[in-house]
Design a protein with these regions (language model features):
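Phosphate/diphosphate ligand-binding glycine-rich loop within oxidoreductases
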Residues: 2-119
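Conserved acidic residues
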Residues: 43-45, 156, 177
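Short acidic/polar active-site loop segments enriched in Thr and Asp
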Residues: 62, 124, 148
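Glycine-rich adenosine-cofactor-binding loop
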Residues: 14, 115, 124-143
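NAD(P)-binding Rossmann-fold cofactor-contacting core
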Residues: 147-167
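Conserved small/polar residues in nucleotide/adenosyl-binding loops
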Residues: 173-180
Length: 181
């Protein structure tokens, strides 16, 4: 008896996901890499998330991407989290390894990898414009990469302060923006 699917299966779970181009892109990337993998786009309402993850685990899916509204709710169903996902409190990718579902957040990783091609962020002082999900992800990854300071500049003081508090609680040094002083 085979405990893995014949083809590796990866999925996207969210609601709404109609029109999401990820399946088109991923299937072509798998093909170009010579991988016999399939990518499924699955419309999963919040009340069915637990069952969908149990199905993902039971059917041996290789992993999945998680989008709204599941990026935070998925955490309670996982076996472990990467450091970045733990700090951000949000997951956008889940990998299944040895029956364990491991959550990751890759939203800020691409930015930092691109930045490192130009300059090493270690020791840099950074200004972050915004405090939403993308800013949160990039700020955490910059902190993990060793920046010396992150100055958060945001339209609303409370949301900016939430990001500053998150970073300070993660032992990263940040400053309020001059506008907030």
């Amino acid at each position: 008896m085979v405990d893995r699917p014949i083809e590796e299966i990866v999925c996207c779970m969210g609601q709404p996901v109609a029109g999401n181009p990820t399946q088109f892109i991923m299937e072509r990337a798998f093909n170009a890499a010579g991988l016999d993998w399939r990518y499924l786009t699955l419309e999963v309402p919040p009340e069915n998330l637990s069952g969908a993850l149990a199905g993902m685990r039971a059917m041996g899916f290789r992993g999945g991407n998680f989008t709204i509204p599941h990026k935070v709710a998925v955490i309670e169903h996982l076996d472990d989290l990467s450091e970045a996902a733990r700090l951000m409190g949000a997951v956008n990718c889940v990998n299944q390894k040895d029956g364990q579902l491991i959550g990751e957040n890759t939203d800020g990783k691409g930015f930092v990898q691109s930045l490192k091609k130009i300059v090493d962020p270690s020791g840099l002082k950074v200004a972050m414009f915004g405090a939403g999900g993308a800013a949160r992800a990039v700020s955490v990854e910059l902190g993990l990469s060793g920046v010396s300071e992150i100055i958060v500049i945001n339209r609303t003081e409370s949301r900016g302060q939430d990001l500053v508090d998150l970073l300070n609680n993660c032992l990263l040094y940040t400053s309020p923006s001059p506008r907030d002083s």
